[in-house]
């Protein structure tokens, strides 16, 4: 019988991974969602929804544009670091990472996606069901790397961060005619909640037990929505904010239902509405100055390719701003929001 030996370098990598896993209360952060948590997956698919160019990432370690729709790190990155894991969660499709990197954290999120498959179709990004397929593939690779028992423990003990939903309304329902012709806004919310339930049950069946499930923020206060608010120009669009409150209420009821029905599951509903409303309306309390416009360009409508390095109007200090581009928060805002939720997460999941 042939005897197989692990090379010292491979053995060292595995041992380092195991020590990291053993030393953390949560062994890994596993992320699903949209641009609020996409750490670069869209760099590796054919889509216009990318942020892998300057000035994106200018405050990221090394000043690299990683594909994060931010000047620096995302809330999921800060949560990973707060749990004693690595300071950034790598994108699953990034070939510069491998399963040893993903053993303590992995991101399947895709900027521009939503609960609704038709939302992903708008910009040709990864639909939520495909994120789940990548998760299955990841589980198989993790088992091959660490063995089934140890991999299953990581899957069971990891914290799952889910952040998605805004695009379904702003990119799809209120922009394109198809869903509006099929659903009233109340019916569409119910449709999305049904998809959310199927998704959460799917990852539960795949082993997920600890989840931070994020609602949607006051999307009427995004700079892009302020500038297009015809009823009250440059003010928060109240109808969109009211919708966010309504939708978050439906998501909260879903979380209550699943926590009651699914054995062993614990879902924390991370409702970002109140903290983001507080930051937007009272930025000075958080060491910020400007919330009505963004850092990039004019701060009113630029995001993605419109937020290019040649735009002379881009601010010099993003730490003064709530928003980085017309749709996404700055690194500083992401850190504030992450810190806010971590106070609850650290007591729930350990």
From Swiss-Prot:
Native species: Arabidopsis thaliana (Mouse-ear cress)
PANTHER family in alphabetical order: GDSL ESTERASE/LIPASE EXL3, GDSL-LIKE LIPASE_ACYLHYDROLASE
Domain of life assignment: Eukaryota
Keywords carried by this UniProt record: Glycoprotein, Hydrolase, Lipid degradation, Lipid metabolism, Secreted, Signal
Gene3D superfamilies the UniProt entry points to: SGNH hydrolase
Residues the record marks as active site: 35, 325, 328
Predominant location category: secreted
Keyword flag Membrane: no
Subcellular location(s) of the protein: Secreted
Gene Ontology biological-process entries: lipid catabolic process
Protein name: GDSL esterase/lipase At2g42990
Family: Belongs to the 'GDSL' lipolytic enzyme family.
């Amino acid at each position: 019988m042939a005897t197989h030996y692990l090379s010292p370098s491979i053995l060292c990598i595995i041992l380092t991974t195991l020590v990291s896993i053993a030393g953390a209360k949560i062994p890994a952060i596993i992320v699903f969602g949209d641009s609020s948590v996409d750490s670069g997956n869209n760099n590796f698919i054919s889509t216009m929804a990318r942020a892998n160019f300057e000035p994106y990432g200018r405050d990221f370690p090394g000043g690299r544009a990683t594909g994060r729709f931010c000047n620096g790190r995302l809330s999921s990155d800060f949560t990973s670091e707060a749990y004693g894991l690595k300071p950034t969660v790598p994108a699953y499709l990034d070939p510069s990472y491998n399963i040893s990197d993903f053993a303590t954290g992995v991101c399947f999120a895709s900027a521009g996606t939503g609960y609704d498959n038709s939302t992903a179709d708008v910009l040709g990004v990864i639909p939520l069901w495909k994120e789940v397929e990548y998760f299955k593939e990841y589980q198989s690779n993790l088992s091959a790397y660490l063995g089934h028992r140890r991999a299953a423990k990581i899957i069971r003990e990891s914290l799952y961060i889910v952040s998605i939903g805004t695009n379904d309304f702003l990119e799809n329902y209120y922009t394109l005619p198809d869903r509006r012709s099929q659903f009233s806004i109340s019916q569409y919310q119910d449709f999305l909640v049904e998809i959310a339930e199927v998704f959460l049950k799917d990852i539960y069946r795949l082993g997920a037990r600890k989840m931070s499930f994020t609602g949607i923020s006051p999307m009427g206060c995004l700079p892009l929505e302020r500038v297009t608010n015809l009823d009250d120009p440059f003010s928060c669009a109240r109808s969109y904010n009211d919708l966010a409150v309504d939708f978050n209420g439906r998501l909260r009821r879903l979380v209550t239902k699943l926590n009651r029905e699914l054995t062993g599951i614990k879902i924390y509903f991370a409702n970002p509405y109140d903290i983001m409303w507080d930051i937007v309306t009272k930025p000075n309390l958080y060491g910020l100055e400007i919330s009505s416009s963004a850092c990039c360009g004019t701060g009113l409508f630029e995001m993605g390719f419109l937020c290019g390095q040649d735009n002379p109007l881009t601010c010099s200090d993003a730490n003064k701003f709530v928003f980085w581009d017309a749709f996404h928060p700055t690194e500083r805002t992401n850190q504030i929001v992450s810190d806010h939720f971590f106070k609850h997460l650290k007591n729930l999941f350990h």
